[in-house]
């Protein structure tokens, strides 16, 4: 797996206007090649909120849905995906 640093460097080279979700580097999983934006794992984002901020799962999910998933910062807003293994 590529590190968040490598993904950020690669994406910034391809699309210098790409935006990243602050504090969620551990959840950065790739690049959407159709729009060249950052792609994050939703479950990992929620885990980060639970671990680093101390929220329970319900609060972390609600916070993520409203404040992160629901925010639109323009054309290069990151994408969030649910990964099923």
Predicted regions and their residues:
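C-terminal alpha-helical interaction appendages
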Residues: 1-85
């Amino acid at each position: 797996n590529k590190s968040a640093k490598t993904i950020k460097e690669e994406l910034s080279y391809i699309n210098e206007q790409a935006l990243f979700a602050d504090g969620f580097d551990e959840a950065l999983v790739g690049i959407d090649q159709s729009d060249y934006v950052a792609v994050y794992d939703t479950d990992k984002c929620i885990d980060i909120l639970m671990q680093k901020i101390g929220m329970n799962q319900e609060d972390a999910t609600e916070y993520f849905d409203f404040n992160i998933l629901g925010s639109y910062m323009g054309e290069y807003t990151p994408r969030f995906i649910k990964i099923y293994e």
